């Protein structure tokens, strides 16, 4: 696998304390605020007119929760990310035509949200491990492009 045993345990220890529903909504919401061009994939989600509207939007929260539950699933199959995300890759890439760059952006936003939530607990080694994970997941999701 691409993570050492040590990194896996850092990732899993922190993840066991994550409120997946809450963090998912926050990460997706921040993606749409910070990188507004990503909003074009979410035009059916209703009011995205301001940061407050986005962060309070129930459809954004619901999809964020879905996204992070998939990510959680990926962590359980960390050595087979391509297999785990094959169907989602197909959906996002072939059917929805999402630019794979957006998966990287969301991964970076997720790292910011975790840092924000966990403060000092989100040490440099923990961040390093998470950066590897989000890059691995983004790659797996972009897989259908290669």
UniProtKB/Swiss-Prot annotation:
<dbReference type="GO" id="GO:0005833">
    <property type="term" value="C:hemoglobin complex"/>
</dbReference>
<dbReference type="InterPro" id="IPR002337">
    <property type="entry name" value="Hemoglobin_b"/>
</dbReference>
<dbReference type="Pfam" id="PF00042">
    <property type="entry name" value="Globin"/>
</dbReference>
<dbReference type="GO" id="GO:0072562">
    <property type="term" value="C:blood microparticle"/>
</dbReference>
<keyword id="KW-0349">Heme</keyword>
<comment type="function">
    <text>Involved in oxygen transport from the lung to the various peripheral tissues.</text>
</comment>
<dbReference type="GO" id="GO:0043177">
    <property type="term" value="F:organic acid binding"/>
</dbReference>
<dbReference type="GO" id="GO:0042744">
    <property type="term" value="P:hydrogen peroxide catabolic process"/>
</dbReference>
<feature type="domain" description="Globin">
    <location>
        <begin position="2"/>
        <end position="146"/>
    </location>
</feature>
<dbReference type="GO" id="GO:0046872">
    <property type="term" value="F:metal ion binding"/>
</dbReference>
<dbReference type="GO" id="GO:0004601">
    <property type="term" value="F:peroxidase activity"/>
</dbReference>
<dbReference type="InterPro" id="IPR000971">
    <property type="entry name" value="Globin"/>
</dbReference>
<feature type="modified residue" description="N6-acetyllysine">
    <location>
        <position position="59"/>
    </location>
</feature>
<dbReference type="GO" id="GO:0031838">
    <property type="term" value="C:haptoglobin-hemoglobin complex"/>
</dbReference>
<keyword id="KW-0479">Metal-binding</keyword>
<dbReference type="GO" id="GO:0020037">
    <property type="term" value="F:heme binding"/>
</dbReference>
<keyword id="KW-0597">Phosphoprotein</keyword>
<feature type="modified residue" description="N6-acetyllysine">
    <location>
        <position position="144"/>
    </location>
</feature>
<comment type="similarity">
    <text>Belongs to the globin family.</text>
</comment>
<feature type="binding site" description="proximal binding residue">
    <location>
        <position position="92"/>
    </location>
    <ligand>
        <name>heme b</name>
    </ligand>
</feature>
<keyword id="KW-0561">Oxygen transport</keyword>
<feature type="modified residue" description="N6-acetyllysine">
    <location>
        <position position="82"/>
    </location>
</feature>
<dbReference type="InterPro" id="IPR009050">
    <property type="entry name" value="Globin-like_sf"/>
</dbReference>
<dbReference type="InterPro" id="IPR050056">
    <property type="entry name" value="Hemoglobin_oxygen_transport"/>
</dbReference>
<dbReference type="GO" id="GO:0019825">
    <property type="term" value="F:oxygen binding"/>
</dbReference>
<dbReference type="GO" id="GO:0031720">
    <property type="term" value="F:haptoglobin binding"/>
</dbReference>
<dbReference type="InterPro" id="IPR012292">
    <property type="entry name" value="Globin/Proto"/>
</dbReference>
<comment type="subunit">
    <text>Heterotetramer of two alpha chains and two beta chains.</text>
</comment>
<keyword id="KW-0813">Transport</keyword>
<keyword id="KW-0408">Iron</keyword>
<protein>
    <recommendedName>
        <fullName>Hemoglobin subunit beta</fullName>
    </recommendedName>
</protein>
<feature type="modified residue" description="Phosphoserine">
    <location>
        <position position="44"/>
    </location>
</feature>
<dbReference type="GO" id="GO:0005344">
    <property type="term" value="F:oxygen carrier activity"/>
</dbReference>
<dbReference type="GO" id="GO:0031721">
    <property type="term" value="F:hemoglobin alpha binding"/>
</dbReference>
<keyword id="KW-0007">Acetylation</keyword>
<feature type="modified residue" description="S-nitrosocysteine">
    <location>
        <position position="93"/>
    </location>
</feature>
<keyword id="KW-0702">S-nitrosylation</keyword>
<feature type="binding site" description="distal binding residue">
    <location>
        <position position="63"/>
    </location>
    <ligand>
        <name>heme b</name>
    </ligand>
</feature>
């Amino acid at each position: 696998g691409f993570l050492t045993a040590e990194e896996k345990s850092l990732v899993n220890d922190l993840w066991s304390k994550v409120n997946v529903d809450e963090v998912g909504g926050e990460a997706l919401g921040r993606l749409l605020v910070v990188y507004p061009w990503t909003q074009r994939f979410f035009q059916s989600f209703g009011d995205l007119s301001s940061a407050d509207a986005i962060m309070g939007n129930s459809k954004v929260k619901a999809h964020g929760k879905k996204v992070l539950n998939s990510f959680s699933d990926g962590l359980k199959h960390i050595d087979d990310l391509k297999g785990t995300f094959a169907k989602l890759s197909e959906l996002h890439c072939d059917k929805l035509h999402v630019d794979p760059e957006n998966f990287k952006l969301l991964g970076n936003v997720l790292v910011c949200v975790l840092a924000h939530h966990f403060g000092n607990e989100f040490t440099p080694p923990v961040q390093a491990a998470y950066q590897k994970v989000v890059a691995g997941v983004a790659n797996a999701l972009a897989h259908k492009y290669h």
